[in-house]
UniProtKB/Swiss-Prot annotation:
<keyword id="KW-0444">Lipid biosynthesis</keyword>
<keyword id="KW-0812">Transmembrane</keyword>
<feature type="region of interest" description="Disordered">
    <location>
        <begin position="1"/>
        <end position="31"/>
    </location>
</feature>
<dbReference type="GO" id="GO:0004605">
    <property type="term" value="F:phosphatidate cytidylyltransferase activity"/>
</dbReference>
<keyword id="KW-0548">Nucleotidyltransferase</keyword>
<keyword id="KW-0472">Membrane</keyword>
<protein>
    <recommendedName>
        <fullName>Phosphatidate cytidylyltransferase</fullName>
        <ecNumber>2.7.7.41</ecNumber>
    </recommendedName>
</protein>
<feature type="transmembrane region" description="Helical">
    <location>
        <begin position="58"/>
        <end position="78"/>
    </location>
</feature>
<keyword id="KW-1208">Phospholipid metabolism</keyword>
<keyword id="KW-0443">Lipid metabolism</keyword>
<dbReference type="InterPro" id="IPR000374">
    <property type="entry name" value="PC_trans"/>
</dbReference>
<feature type="transmembrane region" description="Helical">
    <location>
        <begin position="157"/>
        <end position="177"/>
    </location>
</feature>
<dbReference type="GO" id="GO:0016024">
    <property type="term" value="P:CDP-diacylglycerol biosynthetic process"/>
</dbReference>
<dbReference type="Pfam" id="PF01148">
    <property type="entry name" value="CTP_transf_1"/>
</dbReference>
<dbReference type="GO" id="GO:0005886">
    <property type="term" value="C:plasma membrane"/>
</dbReference>
<feature type="transmembrane region" description="Helical">
    <location>
        <begin position="110"/>
        <end position="130"/>
    </location>
</feature>
<keyword id="KW-0594">Phospholipid biosynthesis</keyword>
Length: 312
């Protein structure tokens, strides 16, 4: 039986443009949870190898990786928003995102907040002078002409995006600066990967009870339990032996990180559902876009930095 849109009662593949085509393209050579598993594993191992080598031999290169990820992920979301009719000031958003992460190097959290604040202010002004129908050529600005329409919608989406990607990712960069910074980054990334792998595996094998079916039909309570078990085990070990924290801090951190990973995934799923798309991009075979792999990492980075900084 086809899923229906809760607001209209019409079949979901008819009520949300692009879903039917995306579903048809994604079902070929994919398992139950919708991934091309061999490609996903190959890409995941490649990314993991780069991260491990970076953190072991040159930890500060992590900031470069964060900056690159911010640019690519922000561009993916901007493109999708524009396809849906939003008028997003991409130039100041992408440049401001770089300032947000790079200012963490000399100024730490103050730099991240200053970069984010400046990005928001410039984007709000930029949107005022953009042509509503100029989605590809932002240099065509005008201080006169027809009144700006949908300003609140577009400005709100821009501020949301500036917080969601550059600001949240800057906390991932902040993790690497202390003496045990590499261990802290390992703690974050291993926790996220363990939560994702545990949830995916258990969900595919045993998932029967949907977690939030109206947002993400493939997620199940059984998968969440798998995330909790795997994420908790991995985080306690990494927080204790790599970040130098007590086991109770690792246990508390693990529980919160599993929640933020799951909620981050659900937030991106809802955004994609609003936009009528399956993936943010096609950069990573078996995964979708880069943003589709960062959905759980971004909010988890904020939590990881906060708890690893404040707790003994």
């Amino acid at each position: 039986m086809a899923s229906t849109d809760p607001g209209t009662g019409t079949p979901l593949d008819e009520s949300v443009p692009g879903i039917k085509r995306a579903m048809r393209q994604s079902t070929k050579n994919t398992p139950r949870a919708g991934r091309n598993l061999p490609a996903a594993i190959a890409v995941g191992l490649s990314i993991g190898g780069v991260l491990v080598a970076t953190l072991v031999f040159a930890p500060r290169i992590w900031v470069v990786l964060c900056a690159g990820a911010i640019f690519v992920a922000s561009h993916e979301v901007v493109r999708r928003l524009r396809e849906a009719g939003y008028v997003i000031p991409a130039i100041p958003l992408l440049i401001g995102g770089q300032f947000t992460v790079w200012l963490t190097w000399p100024y730490r959290t103050v730099g991240a907040l200053a970069g984010f604040g400046a990005t928001v202010v410039v984007c709000m002004i930029w949107r005022l002078v953009m042509h509503d129908n100029s989605k590809q050529h932002e240099s065509r600005e005008a201080l006169a002409g027809p009144p700006v329409s949908n300003y609140l919608r577009d400005a709100s989406a821009t501020v949301f995006l500036a917080a969601w990607v550059p600001l949240f990712a800057s906390f991932a960069a902040l993790l690497v600066y202390p003496k045990d910074g590499a261990g802290r980054v390992f703690c974050l990334m291993i926790a996220v990967v363990a939560s994702d792998v545990g949830g995916y595996t258990v969900g595919v094998l045993f998932g029967k009870h949907p977690l939030v079916p109206r947002i993400s039909p493939n997620k199940s309570w059984e998968g969440f339990a798998g995330s909790l078990v795997c994420g908790t085990t991995a985080t306690i070990l990494t927080a204790t032996f790599l970040a130098g924290k007590t086991p109770w801090v690792g246990a508390l951190l693990s529980f919160v990180l599993v929640l933020t990973c799951t909620l981050g995934d659900l937030v991106e799923s809802q955004v994609k559902r609003d936009l009528g798309i399956k993936d943010m991009g096609r950069l990573l075979p078996g995964h979708g876009g880069l943003m589709d792999r960062l959905d759980g990492v971004l909010p988890s980075a904020v939590v990881a930095w906060t708890m690893l900084t404040l707790l003994p």
